[in-house]
Swiss-Prot record:
It catalyses: tRNA(Gly) + glycine + ATP = glycyl-tRNA(Gly) + AMP + diphosphate. HAMAP family: Gly_tRNA_synth_beta (MF_00255). Disulfide bonds: none annotated. NCBIfam families: glyS. This is Glycine--tRNA ligase beta subunit. It comes from Ruthia magnifica subsp. Calyptogena magnifica. SUPFAM superfamilies: HD-domain/PDEase-like (SSF109604). It is found in: Cytoplasm. Tetramer of two alpha and two beta subunits. One of its GO terms (biological process) is arginyl-tRNA aminoacylation. It is an enzyme of class 6 (ligase).
């Protein structure tokens, strides 16, 4: 089979950096999908992406389709002649050309023909065109007088098989083998002589590294080295690194300075200004303090680097001066004095203003504080003030600083440290893997705020549907569960949901407790799935409806401890045996008339069950409880070996059924292990 490497490069104006990887992945996926549809084989695929180009290299692409036997099934041989003639005509042949074949138990007319495989070079134009058009673009652009759309205007197109150009015209561009280097330095235009050497040629001729991940690691190493040169430690945010990588083709990292006077501004504000506006990396000294130095990555090798550094220093000086101004202006007004402004900020239609929300948070934070042992006064105070920073200049400019700046402003206002910390951390966890609030008061406010949002929005019928979650309630619910589980808070979730609903807006359906609880349980399922917990373990615990997510977690941990434990597997089988006996009976009790028992084995089981019940029913040491149940198994087995449950004596039968129902209740005190098949 003859093969050649196929190169596709689409040259564009600067692509949106935050979606460059997504575009590259879609570009590659769509192309390989179309090649697969054409049954064209290849050995491997490489994706390349820079700010000005998307490229794919398909190695050892089959140069011609294999010949195929095309077969069409027609009417049965007993069909009307006109139907058979019509089928033959649709195939472009006479009736006598059709063949008869048995399909199932019936004979049908079939038309078969051999279709010669087409040359790949003749298929690539339409294949590439479809691949490009199928890229999902939220905000497409039009340019020139062309009736085409793309994320940015396109300027050149390379399509090559080996060293040969594939003739094509796509989006008004004629294919060729000419690419472009950097805009302002080096070779501006040059040819790709061979598809497989694409990456090498661009690197040698224009110093452009087209592989995204390779370029990313180059930037990482350069940033680390620049930090070392400044006797500092670079803080590399992966999302910022991805964005910077999507902004440069020829990365050259350098450092610049800003006045140390700006260090009087909270460091989070300085870092946010450097990251969001300038795409700078910040540096810390050996003690972890922010240094008045930044690292930027240029897209050019300059003979006069000082000019670039000076320009960046002037820009960051202006940005940090703005942050300093916001900080000074905001401190002139207390958080409490801003409460009235929150009445003009809409939280959500039907749920009132932010002013309404903080009143609910204040009350609910105080309640939760009493339950978890936090300071009630500080928790309520933090709940009242936790949203005031939303109307400050700093948070208006840097939305990611909400909460953080509130903590600083609280300290400036003379609020105590517990209140300030709770305000600062009440949004946590903000994303997967984020830290939890560190203080009890912060936990109380975080729970109150998140529950108010989740119950309110779902309570007015605006909860997530399918893949749509416009208010990020799934993430918020997961954060709530993480707080309760990882902070070891034994809180009754249904009770909290009910209380939150009753304190919410009058538009909220207070009867949606079960719906919200089930929503939370689906998020808990996702939480354990991410942790690779056997889904049967989750279902076994869910079946006994623990009131507290933390208690739920303790049960899951206990069951996980006994995975692949033969003694536990035997216990599961015993439980299933009991469940099978009891499934045909209703209205059974766990109160046993022991005076009706006659056999030694059943009396022994009664005595052991009574003793075990006292030890485990109020215990949350579920690992120990399971160990006790495993030790209990021999007594249960002895009972089944020596005693007939379904005796003719009605009173005795009822006593025995109640006894094994009592035994089953001990199993259910941990989980419904009938869901397990470990």
């Amino acid at each position: 089979m003859n093969t050649k490497d196929f190169l596709l490069e689409l040259g564009c104006e600067e692509l949106p950096p935050k979606c460059l990887q997504q575009l590259s992945n879609a570009f590659t996926h769509n192309l390989t999908t179309e090649l697969d549809k054409l049954k064209l084989s290849y050995s491997s695929v490489e994706s390349f992406a820079t700010p000005r180009r998307l490229a794919v290299l398909v190695s050892n692409l089959q140069l011609q389709q294999n010949d195929q036997i095309i077969e069409r099934k027609g009417p049965s041989i007993s069909a009307f002649d006109q139907d058979i003639e019509g089928f033959a005509k649709s195939c472009g042949v006479a009736k006598n050309v059709l063949v008869q074949k048995t399909f199932g138990k019936t004979q049908y007319y079939f038309f078969t023909k051999q279709q010669k495989g087409l040359k790949t070079i003749d298929l690539l134009e339409s294949t590439v065109d479809i691949a490009i058009q199928n890229i999902s673009i939220i905000k497409p652009m039009r340019w020139s007088n062309l009736d085409t759309y793309f994320v940015r205007p396109t300027h050149w197109l390379i399509m090559m098989l080996g060293s040969d150009v594939v003739p094509a015209s796509i989006m008004g561009l004629a294919s060729g083998n000419t690419t472009r280097g950097l805009r302002f330095t080096g070779e501006r235009i040059f040819d790709i002589t061979c598809a497989k050497d694409y990456q090498k040629i661009l690197l040698e001729r224009a110093q452009i590294e087209v592989d995204f991940n390779t370029r990313k690691e180059i930037i990482r190493k350069q940033v680390i080295q620049v930090a070392k040169n400044n006797n500092a430690i670079a803080v590399i945010d992966e999302s910022l690194l991805d964005e910077v990588c999507a902004l440069v083709e020829y990365p050259r990292a350098f450092s610049g300075n800003f006045s140390s006077k700006f260090l009087d501004v909270p460091e989070e504000a300085l870092i946010s200004a450097m990251k969001s506006h300038q795409k700078y990396f910040h540096m810390l000294d050996v003690d972890g303090n922010l240094m008045p130095v930044f690292i930027s990555v240029a897209n050019i090798e300059s003979s006069n680097l000082s000019v670039i550094i000076d320009g960046n220093e002037r820009v960051i000086r202006s940005r940090l001066a703005d942050s300093e101004f916001f900080w000074t202006q905001d401190k002139a007004h207390t958080l409490e004095s801003r409460l009235d402004k929150l009445n003009q900020v809409l939280f959500m239609k039907s749920l009132g203003s932010m002013g309404d929300k903080i009143k609910r948070i204040e009350i609910f934070s105080g309640y939760i504080a009493t339950v978890i042992g936090a300071n009630v006064k500080d928790s309520a105070r933090a709940g009242l003030l936790c949203k005031s920073d939303l109307v400050t200049d700093m948070v208006g400019e840097f939305a990611d600083l909400q909460g953080v700046m509130g903590g600083y402003y609280a300290l400036n206002d003379g609020e105590n440290k517990a209140v300030a910390s709770a305000i600062s951390e009440h949004y946590h966890p903000r994303f997967s893997g984020d830290s939890l609030p560190n203080t009890s008061e912060g936990l109380a406010v975080a729970i109150a705020d998140k529950l108010d949002t989740v119950t309110g929005i779902i309570g007015i019928g605006q909860g997530p549907t399918g893949s749509k979650d416009p208010y990020a309630l799934r993430r918020m619910a997961l954060g709530l569960l993480r707080i309760m589980i990882e902070s070891k808070l034994n809180l009754n979730l249904k009770e909290l949901i009910s209380k939150s609903l009753n304190e919410n807006s009058s538009a909220v359906n207070i009867n949606s407790v079960d719906d919200i609880y089930q929503f939370m349980m689906r998020r808990l399922r996702a939480y354990y799935k991410e942790q690779k917990v056997n889904i049967q373990v989750f279902e076994a615990v869910l079946a006994v409806c623990p009131e507290s997510p933390y208690d739920f977690h303790l049960r899951v941990e206990a069951l996980n401890t006994f995975t692949n434990n033969q003694a536990f597997e035997n216990l599961i089988e015993t439980n299933k045996r009991i469940a099978n006996i009891l499934k045909n009976y209703s209205n059974l009790l766990i109160k046993v008339d022991d005076s009706a028992l006659v056999e030694v084995a059943e009396k022994a089981l009664f005595k052991a069950t009574k003793s075990l019940s006292k030890r485990i029913l109020n215990s949350t040491n579920y690992t120990k409880n399971i160990q006790e149940l495993i030790a209990f198994k021999d007594i249960i087995d002895e009972f089944f070996d020596k005693v007939m449950v379904n005796t003719d004596d009605v009173v005795l039968r009822q006593a025995r059924l109640n006894l094994i129902n009592w035994v089953r209740s001990l199993f259910l005190s941990v989980a419904d292990v009938s869901h397990l098949s470990l």
